[in-house]
Amino acid sequence: MEASQLDQISSVLKQGGEPAATLHEALRLIMTALNSETGTIHRLDSEKQLLHLVAQVGLPPFMLDVVKTIPVGKGIAGETVVRGGPVTMCNLQTDTSGVAKPGAKQTGVGGAVCVPIRRGDVIVGTIGIGTGREYEYTSEETHLLEKVGRLLGNSLT
């Protein structure tokens, strides 16, 4: 992802408009830049310790109920909040760490990475992307996704 792509994402977020459509477009741009087929953005309800799906691209329809609400500490997105940093998997289908829940394996995703969305130093959500093939996102790709997470921070309300 080049600086121009970050600028493009920033521009989409600054344009405003309908929040769900804006987040969906930003997610689509991020996925294209990182050659990914699936993506989710979750907003954190820190009081209830739940992540709520606010945008997704590429998930099978039957998975939407599974990822609609995720408790902090559960699954890849929930673990991202607990760690306060990235969670990556080379192949979600063969993961034995216990982080990827059985339902997540139904997505067909191989490589995956999820990072916090921050407003300042406060985690306000997560952004996760994945690909259908076995793939380990590089530290550079993860770092760029974290930059996007900071851009998204003010867009989650």
Segment roles from a protein language model:
Residues 110-118:
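A short, aliphatic-rich beta-strand micro-motif
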Residues 27-31, 37-43, 78:
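Short, hydrophobic-rich beta-strand element in sensory/regulatory alpha-beta domains
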Residues 44, 50-52, 61-94:
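Regulatory sensory and allosteric helical modules in signal-transduction proteins
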Residues 1-21, 32:
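Signal-transmission linkers at sensory-effector interfaces
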Residues 117-127:
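Short hydrophobic/glycine-rich mini-motifs in sensory/regulatory modules
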Residues 146-154:
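Allosteric cytosolic regulatory segments
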Residues 50, 60-63, 90-111, 131:
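Signal-transducing coupling segments at domain and membrane junctions
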Residues 126-136:
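Short beta-strand-to-loop transition segments that serve as allosteric relay/switch motifs
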